[in-house]
C-alpha cells in the first residue's frame, strides 16, 4: 500500500527523490524496466500479485511502450553495447516525459537479455502474451545464430547468469508450480500444449488438453500428494518413476445438486 501511495504516478512506478540531480545514478520519473522485479519473483514462487493487478498491467504496458525499440539506429549509449544498429531491444530505462537526470544510473541506456526475459515473463503472468512475444522475438532476432550465438546471451561476459531468467517464461506459460511442503504439483497454462516441468526429485513433460493432464517422467521419481490442473485436483495415487507415464488424468465430476 505504501508503494502504491508514494511511488505510483498514474501510469507506472517511479523513484521519489527531492532533487534527482543532487546524487549520481538515480532515475526519478523515468520508466524503469526493472520496476516490477519483486512481482516477478512473487509470481515465480506462487505468491500471486503483491501489488494491484491493474497497476501491474499499466506499468508493464508503459515499459513496453516507452522502453522497447524495434530499431536502435538512432539510440545513443555510452556504456556497453549489447544491441546496436537496426537491431531492437528493451532499454533498461527511458524518460518519455523528460526529467532525465544529468548523470542517470549506470547502464540505463543498455539492453540486457536477463531483464528482457524478466519483463516478458511478468507480461505472460499478467495475461499480456502479445507484448511478451514482442519482447522475446526482438531478443531472439539478435541471437539468431548470424551475428550472435543463440546459446550464449552476453551481458557482462559470456553465458551471463541473468539470462537464466528465461526459465521464468516456461513457468509462466505452463503455470507450473511445485509446492514442496504441500507436495503439490500444479499447472495453469495459458493454453493447451506440452510443457517441461520439474519438482524436487523429478523432471518430465506435461501434456494438457482442456481438463485432461498426462505426465511423462523423464528422470527421478514424482511422488506428489496432489496434482492440480487449472485449480482442480486430479487423482494420482501412485508415484511415477523415470520412463513411466500417468494415464490421462481428469478431475472428478462436480456433484450436481438434486432438485
Positions of predicted regions on the chain:
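Short, conserved secondary-structure transition motifs
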Residues: 1-6, 162-164
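Extended glycan-interaction surfaces of carbohydrate-active proteins
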Residues: 4-112, 140, 144-146
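Non-catalytic C-terminal accessory modules of carbohydrate-active enzymes
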Residues: 83-86, 102-105, 109-110, 116-245, ...
Amino acid at each position: 500500500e505504501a508503494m502504491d501511495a508514494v511511488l505510483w504516478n498514474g501510469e507506472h512506478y517511479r523513484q521519489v527523490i527531492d532533487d534527482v540531480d543532487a546524487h549520481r545514478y538515480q532515475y526519478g520519473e523515468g520508466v524503469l524496466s526493472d520496476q516490477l522485479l519483486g512481482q516477478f519473483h512473487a509470481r515465480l514462487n506462487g505468491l500471486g500479485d503483491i501489488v494491484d493487478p491493474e497497476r501491474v498491467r499499466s506499468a508493464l504496458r508503459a515499459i513496453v511502450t516507452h522502453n522497447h525499440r524495434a530499431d536502435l539506429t538512432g539510440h545513443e549509449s555510452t556504456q556497453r553495447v549489447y544491441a546496436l544498429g537496426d537491431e531492437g531491444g528493451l532499454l533498461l530505462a527511458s524518460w518519455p516525459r523528460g526529467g532525465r537526470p544529468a548523470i542517470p544510473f549506470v547502464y540505463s541506456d543498455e539492453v540486457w537479455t536477463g531483464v528482457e526475459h524478466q519483463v516478458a515473463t511478468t507480461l505472460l503472468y499478467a495475461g499480456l502474451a502479445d507484448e511478451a512475444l514482442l519482447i522475446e522475438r526482438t531478443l531472439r532476432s539478435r541471437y539468431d545464430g548470424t551475428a550472435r550465438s543463440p546459446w550464449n546471451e552476453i551481458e557482462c561476459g559470456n553465458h551471463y547468469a541473468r539470462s537464466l531468467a528465461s526459465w521464468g517464461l516456461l513457468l509462466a506459460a505452463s503455470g507450473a508450480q511445485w509446492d514442496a511442503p504441500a507436495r503439490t504439483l500444479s499447472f495453469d497454462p495459458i493454453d493447451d500444449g506440452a510443457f517441461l516441468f520439474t519438482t524436487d526429485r523429478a523432471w518430465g513433460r506435461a501434456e494438457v488438453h482442456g481438463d485432461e493432464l498426462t505426465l511423462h517422467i523423464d528422470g527421478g521419481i514424482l511422488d506428489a500428494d496432489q496434482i492440480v490442473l487449472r485449480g482442480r485436483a486430479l487423482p494420482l495415487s501412485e508415484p511415477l518413476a523415470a520412463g513411466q507415464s500417468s494415464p490421462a488424468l481428469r478431475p472428478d465430476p462436480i456433484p450436481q445438486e438434486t432438485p
